[in-house]
Design a protein with these regions (language model features):
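Intrinsic-disorder/low-complexity regions
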Residues: 1-3, 37
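Bacterial N-terminal signal peptides
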Residues: 18-30
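Detector for intrinsically disordered, low-structure N-terminal pre-sequences
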Residues: 10-12, 29-34
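Bacterial N-terminal signal peptides that target proteins for export
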Residues: 3-21
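General helical secondary-structure elements
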Residues: 4-6, 32, 76
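Secreted/extracellular ectodomain signature
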Residues: 35-175
Length: 175
């Protein structure tokens, strides 16, 4: 009789240990958020289609504040700037003479500062710079005149719609 009880208690303890382990694993699956390695928590696209250097400066400040917040809080992010029309002024050092986007005095005075801040965001914070190729080709700007960090996209407005609709990006335009 004693041997029978001992066998039953050992089976009971084994089942209880296995059951407890199973229960813990099930709870962890429910409680711990499932984040895939390739999943980005924050996706934001900025629309730059304006010519005002002060407005561009404000946008760069906004982006810098955003990426620093994400980095300080260990939040994976994908931040992009899509440049369309007048925005082309900010991704080249070409004066764009004879085009509707020609450099003016305010841009000349701020270009070095704006370039440095933009390229720092691209190189140090992985902010992606995307330029509408329709804009570039319509003014005859050679690709080698663009900052090397700039990626050409077929259409800026199509890209903005795609990022928002298909990829879940938040849209920001600095006014």
């Amino acid at each position: 009789m004693n041997n029978n009880w001992h066998a039953r208690s050992r089976v009971s303890v084994q089942w209880t240990s296995g059951g407890l382990l199973t229960l813990i694993l099930l709870l962890l699956m429910v409680v711990v958020p499932q984040v895939r390695a390739d999943e980005v928590e924050a996706k934001v696209v900025y629309h730059a289609d304006f010519s005002d250097p002060r407005r561009f400066s404000a946008m760069l400040t906004s982006i810098n504040n955003m990426v620093n917040h994400y980095a300080n809080n260990f939040i994976d992010y994908d931040v992009r700037i899509v440049f369309v029309a007048h925005g082309v002024r900010f991704v080249t050092d070409d004066k764009l003479s004879g085009t509707p986007f020609a450099e003016d005095k305010p841009l000349t005075e701020q270009r070095e500062n704006l370039r440095g801040r933009l390229l720092t965001l691209a190189e140090m914070h992985n902010v992606k710079l995307e330029l509408c190729n329709i804009t570039r080709s319509q003014i005859g700007l050679a690709e080698d005149k663009l900052y090397r960090q700039v990626e050409l996209i077929p259409s800026g407005v199509v890209r903005l719609a795609q990022l928002q609709q298909e990829e879940g990006f938040a849209y920001i335009k600095i006014e």
